[in-house]
Amino acid sequence: GTRKTGILLLFLVAATTSFKLPKNESPVLISDDDRIIGGTQAYPNAYPFMVRLTTIWQNGWGGSCGRSLIXSQWVLTAAHCVYNLEKSMYWERVIVYLGDHYSQVTDAHEQVKEAADVIVHENYISSGSNDVALIKLKTPANINSYVKPGCLNSKSNDFIGQDATAAGWGLTSTIGNTISNVLMEATLPIVAPKNCPIINPPTMICTGFKREVGQDTVFKGDSGGPLFLSKNGFTILGVASFVTLDNSYPQKVTSAVFTKVSAHLSWIQENTKATDLWCAKNNHHS
């Protein structure tokens, strides 16, 4: 991977720039301050691997993204959350909130950590593909029932036809700036790649919607957050990357795309060298 310690060059170029879009659809990165649309409020601490991140940029602007704790000292997120070559913006500080539910207050079981290192996938830097990154915490998390790593999916199964969950803090509508200060969740069906106009099936997962009206999906601020299954523990399938919007109805999200975890396991292992990854012995999904 490409590693920068201390100051990291940040990059917000869409992972979709090399694809040709249908005329009626446009890609939108689920970037800083982009959130769950619709959905329901999650039960407090229901997802102990969920991480909220705040970045403080060189110009004083702050951003927010979702992340997943995958080992006691490692967090998984989207590359576009932490790397912006186009704007030549640097983060001065990254703050990671573990065991968080209410973003506006300090929760009883919340742990606050700072980033010691960030690793961005080298293909993202060169071509905008492989929208995935790792953050190493300065000190390991205190693992308990409120803060616990999720398992990384190691199965080749694409889970098409199954329902998965996405979670994040934020925008509850494509209209205006109504932001939720609590963790929200949405159920998203995993659909065949042909349903996503911009997708590289070996490295991406396509999701659709459970209902036609008031569609639940991910949007701005949910970037980097997980797509996961909750049976027999939590298995992380993907990392929120981008959505496509209908050009005729700009408030309508047509699909949401996640970076596929199983396609990046060797990269994650190589760069973290963590011994407590994957939960392979406890991964019951097939």
Curated annotation (Swiss-Prot):
Principal EC category: hydrolase
GO cellular component: extracellular space
Pro-peptide positions on chain: 19-35
PANTHER family assigned: SRCR DOMAIN-CONTAINING PROTEIN (PTHR24264:SF65), TRYPSIN-RELATED (PTHR24264)
All copies of domain Peptidase S1, residue ranges: 36-273
Name of the protein this chain belongs to: Serine protease SSP1
Disulfide bonds: C65-C81, C196-C206
Top-rank taxon, per record: Eukaryota
SUPFAM superfamilies: Trypsin-like serine proteases
GO molecular function, one term: serine-type endopeptidase activity
Single GO BP term: proteolysis
Family designation: Belongs to the peptidase S1 family.
Residues in the signal sequence: 1-18
PROSITE patterns: TRYPSIN_DOM, TRYPSIN_HIS, TRYPSIN_SER
Active site (record annotation): H80, D131, S223
The enzyme's E.C. designation: 3.4.21.-
Cell compartment(s), UniProt: Secreted
